[in-house]
Amino acid sequence: MTNSNRIKLTWISFLSYALTGALVIVTGMVMGNIADYFNLPVSSMSNTFTFLNAGILISIFLNAWLMEIVPLKTQLRFGFLLMVLAVAGLMFSHSLALFSAAMFILGVVSGITMSIGTFLVTQMYEGRQRGSRLLFTDSFFSMAGMIFPMIAAFLLARSIEWYWVYACIGLVYVAIFILTFGCEFPALGKHAPKTDAPVEKEKWGIGVLFLSVAALCYILGQLGFISWVPEYAKGLGMSLNDAGTLVSNFWMSYMVGMWAFSFILRFFDLQRILTVLAGLAAILMYVFNTGTPAYMAWSILALGFFSSAIYTTIITLGSQQTKVPSPKLVNFVLTCGTIGTMLTFVVTGPIVEHSGPQAALLTANGLYAVVFVMCFLLGFVSRHRQHNTLTSH
């Protein structure tokens, strides 16, 4: 593979995460405007965004098999056509059914693109470099989550219709589409070059189960925590502005942590540092949940920084459980994380209704403790060390 080709594929990976981050995180900014557009209460409008999450989940799950049937370049180019149709649907339709369908299509495109982006990084980079590259790639999710809400605020403040926000997000896919030209993608399944050697079916092992449970619990815990921090902070007498600042500080610290750990991870065994980070994150969340408002700003900054590397390290370790990175395995771990996203309000909503926001935060804390236990148990069964030794020879 030529260096320029590798750079193009890496940028496709970066932008695939930026696309998903923009679509998921911008929701809260535009929901009120969309509710007004359809003359609906915000509470019922929020349910239609489940179609976006459902599209992401289904496409990540199915793409584990589709990757071996449909070439990656074809998928990305077809995704561009779907993106144009979805944004056009948002712009020109006043039907809630068509809006929901467009959201589902955006989710499908986003999920397919992100699963391809993740696979490209695991395919192109080996060992510890794979972990640091995946982490840097994931930072584009957070970066888009900071940039696109600002773009949305800029447009909405000038009374520009909400659907132009999605048109701006579509420009990310335009860049991906342009990068596919003159770019060679790894061939998989029936498109892969034929070899005389028999294909070895490699068992995943129990380590993949531990990592999948960790991925689900981590994302469910993180989103369950950050979704209810504003309500919890307001209950302690903080202003809405200060409560919002806590969430902003978390994501800012999270992004800085990703950049820092993309360098730091190269010097440590991934399973050991993952266990340490998961333990630290559980402790810091407990400090936030039980501490006084005076210490909340510092503890959430520390939590954002030290938890930033957990999810991508889980995915990296998953990809290292087999000698050759398996798209099915990587997508399985990603799917478990996405299920965590889908379950966020299903799990935390009833808890808040019956016991208040702090109960939801303590539940999230318990989920982080489960992540720590899974990472600790992984140390006894993980195959990443033997596969790293093989690739280094």
From Swiss-Prot:
InterPro entries listed in its UniProt record: MFS (IPR011701), MFS_dom (IPR020846), MFS_trans_sf (IPR036259), MFS_TsgA (IPR023528), MFS_TsgA-like (IPR050375)
How does the entry describe its membrane topology?
Multi-pass membrane protein
Q: What is this protein called?
A: Protein TsgA
Q: Which Gene3D superfamilies match?
A: MFS general substrate transporter like domains
Q: Does the keyword Nucleotide-binding apply?
A: no
The root-end lineage is: Bacteria, Pseudomonadati, Pseudomonadota, Gammaproteobacteria, Enterobacterales
Key words, A-Z: Cell inner membrane, Cell membrane, Membrane, Transmembrane, Transmembrane helix
Please tell me whether the keyword Transmembrane is annotated for this protein. yes
Q: Which residues cross the membrane?
A: 11-31, 51-71, 78-98, 101-121, 134-154, 162-182, 206-226, 245-265, 273-293, 297-317, 332-352, 361-381
GO MF terms listed in the record are: transmembrane transporter activity
Q: Which domain of life is it from?
A: Bacteria
